């Protein structure tokens, strides 16, 4: 199926002018982007001069770029967890919760590879995010991304969302449901998605999406919010899913964003001819009827053993048992296990050992797995945190005038660019 034919089939709600704009925007190539820890915005711009920060308000730390030959993933700052690469329209979604002043318990039901979790966690360091993924391999990749970003407020779990037990009903203040979909919003980025697209896939996905959204409604706290999103333009996976699951306990909330979007009956679509991204549908729901659960009165999980090994979020101690946790928090430093403690930054608790600052060229060598030679001789052999611009890159051991590399070989980045 050709791209034009696909949009004619899928986007029947668009007029001819809108379909033409959508086709033209895809033929020019998708915008790429990333989310940056706010204090590093200027530093990232210095290292990646081809990026722009075109957004404002809640998305002021999201950048865009268009050049297809650029490789921002091969930069020292990316290795150090300063930014995470993702579609800007994907970054839009987790920024649409209504503002409140409480410490929120958040569930990302289908979190891998982690873009929405990371975007949210950076902006809300006091909240606790349960980032769940049904696939073990994808959950492990999710955990690696969370570790690289050094986020202390994220717990990674591996569960079928439908199997989250009833003990968790009505306790999550905010839920992200980026549901598995047929992927028509990714035709530009992933041409194979166009080759594999069928209407049968749309129908199969819509059935799963309805089940997941019904589960999300059960898990959502009274007055809590759900952001339902897909990267599909099919109405059957978007508004029709919302309509099929609406009941008296749920109300639709308008997304009051400063950005232009395509308004639908129940949500918004971020078409690439309107928004600098690849495409996303999002709908915002609020639970207005249901049981009010006091999380402080729940029978809590036993985290005593975990607490001795990890710095964990206080809310974890109040959650019921039943989560299949892969990564419960930030590992506490142990000099017998230095290779497991790779990243540390503003959002991670750094062990109280010496830092050694190196140049960008030295940082590239270190990340590739090499030793780093220093201009100073050190009389004491000791473990140190190797930093660039005060951004921790990993651990090393000083011996005389060099730093022996303690990065695990599996983390070497041989293609890192000067």
Segments the model singles out, each with a brief description of its role:
Residues 1-48, 276-281, 288-418:
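Polybasic, low-complexity RNA-engagement segments
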Residues 101, 163-176:
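A short acidic, Gly/Pro-enriched loop at the edge of an enzyme's catalytic core
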Residues 102-112:
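Conserved class I S-adenosyl-L-methionine
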Residues 113-125:
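Conserved SAM-binding loop of SAM-dependent methyltransferases across substrates and taxa
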Residues 124, 220-222:
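Helix-to-beta-strand junctions that scaffold the AdoMet/dcAdoMet cofactor pocket
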Residues 132-169:
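S-adenosyl-L-methionine
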Residues 137, 174-214, 231-238, 257-258:
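Mobile active-site "lid"/loop adjacent to the S-adenosyl-L-methionine
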Residues 172, 225-228, 232-310:
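Class I S-adenosyl-L-methionine
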């Amino acid at each position: 199926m050709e791209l034009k034919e696909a949009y004619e089939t899928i986007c029947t709600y668009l007029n001819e002018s809108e379909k033409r704009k959508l086709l033209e925007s895809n033929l020019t190539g998708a915008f790429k982007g990333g989310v940056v820890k706010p204090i590093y915005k200027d530093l990232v711009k210095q290292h990646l001069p081809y990026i722009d920060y075109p957004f404002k308000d809640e998305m002021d730390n999201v950048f865009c770029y268009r050049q297809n030959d650029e490789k921002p993933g091969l930069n020292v700052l990316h290795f150090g967890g300063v930014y995470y690469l993702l579609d800007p329209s994907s970054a839009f979604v987790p920024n649409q919760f209504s503002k409140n002043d409480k410490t929120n318990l958040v569930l990302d039901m289908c979190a891998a590879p982690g873009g929405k979790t990371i975007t949210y966690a950076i902006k809300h360091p006091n909240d606790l995010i349960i980032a769940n993924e049904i696939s073990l391999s994808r959950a492990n990749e999710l955990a690696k991304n969370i570790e690289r970003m050094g986020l202390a407020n994220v717990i990674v779990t591996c569960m079928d969302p439908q199997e989250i037990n009833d003990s968790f009903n009505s306790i999550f203040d905010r839920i992200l449901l980026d549901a598995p979909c047929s992927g028509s919003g990714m035709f530009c980025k992933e041409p194979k998605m166009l080759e594999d697209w069928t209407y049968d896939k749309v129908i199969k996905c819509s059935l799963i999406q309805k089940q997941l959204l019904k589960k999300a409604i059960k898990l959502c706290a009274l007055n809590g919010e759900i952001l339902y999103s897909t990267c599909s333009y099919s109405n059957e996976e978007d508004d029709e899913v919302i309509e099929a699951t609406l009941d008296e306990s749920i109300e639709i909330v308008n997304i009051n964003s400063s950005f232009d979007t395509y308004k639908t009956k129940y949500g918004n679509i971020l078409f690439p001819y309107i928004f600098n991204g690849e495409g996303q549908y999002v709908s915002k729901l609020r639970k207005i009827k249901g049981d009010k659960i006091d999380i402080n009165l729940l029978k809590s999980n036993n985290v005593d053993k975990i607490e001795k090994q990890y710095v964990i979020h206080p809310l974890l101690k109040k959650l019921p048992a039943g989560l299949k946790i892969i990564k419960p928090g930030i590992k506490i430093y142990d000099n017998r296990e230095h290779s497991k403690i790779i990243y540390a930054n503003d959002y991670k608790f750094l062990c109280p050992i010496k830092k050694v600052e190196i140049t960008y060229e030295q940082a590239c060598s270190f990340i590739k797995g090499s030793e780093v030679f220093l201009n100073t001789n050190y009389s004491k052999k000791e473990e140190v945190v190797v930093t660039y611009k005060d951004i921790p890159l990993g651990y090393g051991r000083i011996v005389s005038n060099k730093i022996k590399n303690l990065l695990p070989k599996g983390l070497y980045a041989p293609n890192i660019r000067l």
